[in-house]
Structure formats: C-alpha cells, structure tokens
Design a protein with these regions (language model features):
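Charged catalytic and DNA/RNA-contacting regions of genome-maintenance
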Residues: 1-247
Length: 247
C-alpha cells in the first residue's frame, strides 16, 4: 500500500520533526546507508530512527520537563509504569481505583500512553481517557517482565518492548523502582488545577513558574517531581532542607 514520504533538508529536520510530532504523527526516518557511487541503481536507504512523542532522546526535540512514556494494564489492580527514555528513569505503582490512576497520570503528564488490549477494546474507557488526556495512544505487547503484581509486570514489559522497538534495540534503562503514592501528599487532579501548580487558571503565572530558578534540565525536572509529590515523612523533609541550607 502507498506510504506517504517527505524529504526534509537535514538543517531543517529538528524543526520539521517537532512540528509533525505535535500534529500527532509518528515518524520513521530513512537514511542513506551506502555511498552513492557504490549503488547499483537506487541508493539503498533504511529506517534508522522511529520518533514518537514519548520516546524522544534528541535534545533539540525534548521538552524542558520530564518526557514520560506510560503504560497501563489491569489485573490485580491498575498497573501504571513510567519510562523516560532520555534519562533512563523507570518506575511504577499499583493503584486500586481509576480515580487514583487518573490522578497519577495528571501529576506525571506523559507524552504518550500504551494501553493494554483489554483497555484498548473498551470503547467507553478509551473515550473517557481521550477526553481527559489528549495524548498519543499507542500499542505494544504486554508480556510480563520484572517482579511484583501481574498488572505492574505487564506494564513494565510493554514499556521495554515499545522503547526497544523505537530505539533500534539500543536502550539504557535504570533498575525499575516501585513507588508508593501514599508516601506523598495526595494532590488530586482538581487540587493541582485549583492551586495552579503547573497550569494557570487565569493569567500566565503558576507556582512552578514562580519557583523555577533552576539552571539545568535535570534540575528543572527534579523541581517538578518535588512539586508533584510533596513529602509526608519528617525524615526525608529535614534531609532535603539540610541539603538546601548548604547553598
């Protein structure tokens, strides 16, 4: 079947790719893989990159905040896992309700989401999900990997399979980290919106924008993570304050 292709000058690639990704396209980049003088007929080209919103590693295309790919599976609860391919951050949690799932998704704001087959086939769920989260929905095999509850292992497997497929097999990922949302102040979606933590209700100012004096991309992402997950326990709070006092 015919496949639309486009030639983009190499100097304009980043700007063109960014625009196409924002329009909802997945990009397959085909590069010349043999010298033109050695070619017999057409110069051979192969797909060398697959670009999707949640699997970017190119600095010029990455947003300033964490760029999460998320996967959701069901079973013994709602298994939710996140992977930032650009940094290797890999974490997840098991949730008891759909409302808790939506709160975690809103806090992390993934760029792309993988849905398990039982969710993709649920038209009511997909319609509700798209209304709440206007992000790219993609497919991957949900073969269990790692340890823990089945739903969470399925989500882990989907993230790794999809990331490897888009990165051509080359993938550097940190060990999976199980996190407990109960260790942090619970900030539901409505509270984050009302407090204008990341998105303004009026004007342009947000809490994050006022506090953001970071100098590096990792520092900016860390500040975002702290605001998304305020600490509850006294020990970690005092340790963080001690580190800040040194400056």
């Amino acid at each position: 079947f015919p496949t639309p292709v486009a030639g983009i000058p190499i100097r304009a690639f980043d700007a063109s790719a960014e625009r196409l990704l924002k329009m909802g396209f997945r990009l397959a980049v085909a590069d010349q893989v043999e010298p033109a003088e050695e070619a017999e007929g057409l110069v051979r080209r192969e797909v060398t990159q697959l670009l999707t919103p949640g699997t970017l590693t190119q600095e010029a295309l990455l947003p300033r905040e964490a760029n999460y790919l998320a996967a959701i599976a069901t079973g013994d609860g709602w298994g939710l896992a996140f992977l930032d391919v650009s940094t290797g951050e890999f974490k997840g949690t098991l949730l008891k309700s759909k409302s808790a799932l939506y709160d975690e998704l809103f806090r992390h704001r993934p760029a792309e989401v993988l849905l398990a087959p039982e969710l993709r086939e649920n038209e009511a769920f997909v319609a509700e999900f798209r209304k709440r989260f206007p992000v790219m929905l993609s497919e991957a095999p949900f073969e269990p990997q790692g340890e823990g509850p089945l739903a969470l292992r399925r989500a882990q497997g989907a993230l790794l399979a999809y990331a490897r497929a888009t990165q051509g097999g080359a993938l550097s990922v940190r060990p999976f980290r199980l996190y407990d949302p109960g260790a942090f102040v619970r900030l539901p979606e409505a509270s984050l919106k009302a407090l204008e933590v990341f998105e303004p209700l009026r004007g342009q100012d947000t809490l994050f924008g006022v506090l953001d004096e970071t100098r590096t991309a990792p520092g900016r992402r860390l500040l975002q993570a702290w605001l998304r997950h305020p600490l509850l326990e006294r020990g970690p709070l005092e340790a963080r304050l001690d580190r800040v006092e040194r400056f």
